[in-house]
């Protein structure tokens, strides 16, 4: 089992949690982004820079992820592709993407895009909070306890 991170928009506090998990457990954490990322020195932490371009990081994550891997992303279409591969997508707020909720999330995303293209201000997500970080930490710990290396 590995952990991949859609790192361009991932909050720093989430990356720090993942770095601690990598050092503590030996699970490989790979950050994928279209910009240079500084990572702490560890044989279990890697940064993979992809060319700039629409969905380049997403395509590389789909290519690399295997069944059973954890992928941290807020990208709904990426999460859908990962579910098809048998990976486990988790957003940085601690919410799992699943077969049961992905269609609804894709539909909501499409509706919001239509509203925005019609000129309607749909707002955005709430600011990332300590509660979000705690929810992510809880889900990460549970996942690693169930699926991670001993």
Swiss-Prot record:
InterPro entries: UPF0178. Disulfide bonds: none annotated. Pfam families: DUF188. Belongs to the UPF0178 family. PANTHER family: UPF0178 PROTEIN YAII (PTHR35146:SF1). This is UPF0178 protein Bcep1808_1605. It comes from Burkholderia vietnamiensis (strain G4 / LMG 22486).
């Amino acid at each position: 089992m590995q952990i991949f991170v859609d790192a361009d928009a991932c909050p720093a506090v989430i990356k720090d949690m993942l770095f601690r998990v990598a050092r503590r457990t030996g699970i490989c954490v790979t950050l994928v982004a279209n910009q240079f990322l500084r990572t702490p020195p560890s044989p279990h932490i890697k940064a993979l820079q992809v060319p700039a371009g629409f969905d380049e990081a997403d395509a590389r994550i789909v290519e690399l992820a295997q069944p059973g891997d954890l992928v941290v992303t807020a990208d709904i279409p990426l999460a859908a592709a990962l579910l098809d591969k048998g990976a486990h997508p988790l957003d940085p707020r601690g919410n799992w993407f699943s077969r049961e909720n992905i269609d609804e999330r894709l539909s909501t995303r499409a509706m919001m895009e239509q509203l925005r293209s019609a000129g309607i201000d749909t707002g955005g997500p709430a600011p990332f909070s300590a509660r979000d970080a705690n929810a992510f930490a809880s889900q990460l710990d549970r996942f690693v306890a169930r699926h991670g290396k001993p």
